[in-house]
A protein has these predicted regions:
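Positively charged n-region of N-terminal signal peptides that target proteins for export
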Residues: 1-4, 117-119
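Sec-dependent N-terminal signal peptides
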Residues: 3-13
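Subset of outer-membrane beta-barrel
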Residues: 16-293
Length: 293
């Protein structure tokens, strides 16, 4: 446990305070974040906003996980979409003995729209504005656990995302997504820019119930790209299975979704679970619940 904690503390010490987490949502976790391209509302709300373009429902999605299976690293998210607009919320914190040592919150507002469409092809675009807030918590104090420490303050930041997608015959998808293409951080102690990531996604649907996706993800300033591959297969109308692989680092993921349960003929519910391994740390487990009106 001390070894794991040391790794996390060292990684935090040498990284920017405002984090970049690509596996938000059960589907993204299960498919190793190979979700840049395709047609899925969860991916549109939390990732490439171009996938919001053809949405015509009201959807509410919420999820929770402890990163790497550690109780002191809780991650929660909520997303709401109506037509081609979406609102997303994410919170990740570090907690110890009931005290919050640090907390990061992200609020995003997104819109997707069609640039061009005909009988066979479609070109989509999406925009998202993100507002970030980071609370530094309190110092260790005389007790050493932060219970009576001094407030260390907070900081705010903002970022802008943009995504594009081309669709052919609703079977072939090519997408490009840039996160934090433009950003601003109050003050200068946290760095000049938010983490910027660029993703290229390819998806192919050989038939209606099977989705295969390939992503190439590049974090700005990192010379190595991440290659991600994901599969989603609908076994039956109410049950889907998902799996994925990633390189740099090597990770494996899988999960399922059980749903399309109609309640009072007003809305449908879906429950999903997924896990994602890590090359050093324990496995992350993700639970999500969605309601579609």
């Amino acid at each position: 446990m001390k070894y794991i904690l040391s790794i996390i503390l060292l990684s935090i010490s040498f990284s920017q305070v405002f984090s970049s987490y690509d596996y938000l949502g059960s589907r993204a976790t299960a498919m190793s974040a190979a979700i840049t391209s395709g047609d899925h509302i969860e991916s549109g709300i939390f990732h490439n906003p171009a996938q919001l373009s053809n949405n015509s429902n009201i959807t509410i999605i919420s999820g929770y996980s402890n990163l790497y299976g550690l109780d002191f690293l809780p991650l929660s998210h909520v997303g709401i979409s109506k037509n081609n607009y979406a609102l997303s919320f994410k919170n990740i914190s570090t907690e110890f003995n009931g005290n919050t040592l640090s907390s990061e919150t992200a609020l995003g507002v997104a819109k997707g729209f069609n640039l061009y469409s005909d009988r066979q092809s479609l070109i989509q675009m999406g925009l998202r504005f993100n507002f970030y807030s980071y609370d530094f918590g309190e110092s260790a104090g005389t007790e050493g656990d932060g219970s009576n420490g001094i407030n260390l303050g907070s900081s705010n930041a903002s970022g802008f995302d943009i995504g594009f997608q081309g669709v052919l015959n609703k079977k072939y998808y090519v997408a490009y997504y840039i996160k934090n293409i433009s950003s601003y951080i109050e003050g200068s102690s946290l760095g000049l820019n938010l983490p910027k990531t660029m993703s290229i996604g390819l998806s192919y649907l050989p038939y209606k119930d099977l989705v295969t996706s390939l992503d190439i993800n590049q974090l700005s300033g990192n010379k190595d790209s991440e290659i991600r591959f994901g599969i989603e297969y609908k076994l039956m109308e109410s049950f889907k299975i998902r799996t994925g692989l990633q390189s740099n680092p090597n990770r494996f993921s899988a999960g399922f979704e059980f749903g399309n349960i109609k309640l009072a003929n007003l809305y449908t519910c879906n429950f999903s679970y997924s896990f994602l391994t890590h090359h050093v740390l324990p496995t992350t487990h993700q639970f999500s619940l969605s309601v579609k009106f």
